[in-house]
C-alpha cells in the first residue's frame, strides 16, 4: 500500500484548500432601495417585491 514520502506542510495544505469556499448565490440589489436581498423574496429593508409595496414598514 502506498504511503506518503513526506508530511504535507501547512502551506501546501492551505494552497490546496483555497478553492474550497462557499459562494453566496441568489443575491440581488433591491430595485426600490438598493439593499441586497435574496432573489424572489421580499426585501427585508423596505418590504417591496416586484416593484410593489408588499409589506409596509411602519415605525
From Swiss-Prot:
Alphabetized SUPFAM superfamilies for the sequence: Zn-binding ribosomal proteins
Ribosomal protein in keyword set: yes
GO cellular component, as recorded: large ribosomal subunit
Pfam families (UniProt xref): Ribosomal_L32p
Keywords from the UniProt entry: Ribonucleoprotein, Ribosomal protein
Keyword presence, Nuclease: no
A GO molecular function held by the record: structural constituent of ribosome
GO biological process, one term: translation
Family recorded in the similarity comment: Belongs to the bacterial ribosomal protein bL32 family.
HAMAP family named in the record: Ribosomal_bL32
Protein name: Large ribosomal subunit protein bL32C
Protein species of origin: Enterococcus faecalis (strain ATCC 700802 / V583)
Amino acid at each position: 500500500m502506498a504511503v506518503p514520502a513526506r508530511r504535507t506542510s501547512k502551506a501546501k495544505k492551505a494552497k490546496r484548500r483555497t478553492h474550497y469556499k462557499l459562494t453566496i448565490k441568489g443575491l440581488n440589489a433591491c430595485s426600490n432601495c438598493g439593499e441586497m436581498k435574496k432573489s424572489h423574496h421580499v426585501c427585508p429593508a423596505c418590504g417591496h417585491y416586484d416593484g410593489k409595496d408588499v409589506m409596509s414598514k411602519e415605525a
